[in-house]
Swiss-Prot record:
Protein's name in the database: Major prion protein
Record gene name: PRNP
Lineage summary: Eukaryota, Metazoa, Chordata, Craniata, Vertebrata
Intracellular or extracellular location(s): Cell membrane; Golgi apparatus
Region (Disordered), start-end ranges: 28-110
Region of interest (Interaction with GRB2, ERI3 and SYN1), residue spans: 25-233
Quaternary context: Monomer and homodimer. Has a tendency to aggregate into amyloid fibrils containing a cross-beta spine, formed by a steric zipper of superposed beta-strands. Soluble oligomers may represent an intermediate stage on the path to fibril formation. Copper binding may promote oligomerization. Interacts with GRB2, APP, ERI3/PRNPIP and SYN1. Mislocalized cytosolically exposed PrP interacts with MGRN1; this interaction alters MGRN1 subcellular location and causes lysosomal enlargement. Interacts with KIAA1191.
Binding site for Cu(2+) 1: 64-66
Lipid moiety-binding region (GPI-anchor amidated alanine): 233
Propeptide boundaries: 234-256
Disulfide links within the chain: 182-217
Positions that bind Cu(2+) 4: 88, 90-91
Membership in a protein family: Belongs to the prion family.
Amino acid sequence: MVKSHIGSWILVLFVAMWSDVGLCKKRPKPGGGWNTGGSRYPGQGSPGGNRYPPQGGGGWGQPHGGGWGQPHGGGWGQPHGGGWGQPHGGGGWGQGGSHSQWNKPSKPKTNMKHVAGAAAAGAVVGGLGGYMLGSAMSRPLIHFGNDYEDRYYRENMYRYPNQVYYRPVDQYSNQNNFVHDCVNITVKQHTVTTTTKGENFTETDIKIMERVVEQMCITQYQRESQAYYQRGASVILFSPPPVILLISFLIFLIVG
């Protein structure tokens, strides 16, 4: 009778510990759907404009002191005005400006959990603040609601990216935030890289590119979420407390 009561209490303790570890595991919250219609970001400018504006400036390719491919005014990939990674103007990616090496900020500590996730999902891109580059995808088949844009996309889809930049899903509270960030950095990087090669993008290009990249970012989020949960389940299953309790309980049953 005593052994029976002890066995019951051990079983209860085992279940409680297992549940506690599972509840304490940090998981990203599922977000709302993306194809619910309407603007994702109210307060946008021109009709049919961009849904993913960069912070602190005009829309993609807008005439803020210099349009696409212009030599002055801070356009994308330009030699003056503080463009991306440019030697003039300061503020570019990876530029030190007037700061000396003595004032360099300390390097951020590497999160080993993120490194493990990156090894399974994609390579970390240097100089992009921890963003990873996903594997190549087939460009999605999208209907834009009018014949002109549908035809334009079919004829120019090769000009749009087939990989996306993203951060680990556990850094975001929901899918919407992940996709928004993913679209912004992917469109920006692709635009800068392509513009420096001498190819310009029209407003139609940017609009279509955002839609295409949005679908790819949603797919990337789904892949990363599934992989994240699988890694989390493995950690919970083989973490020390549940394993020790399970072994102890089995030994008690065998001996008893």
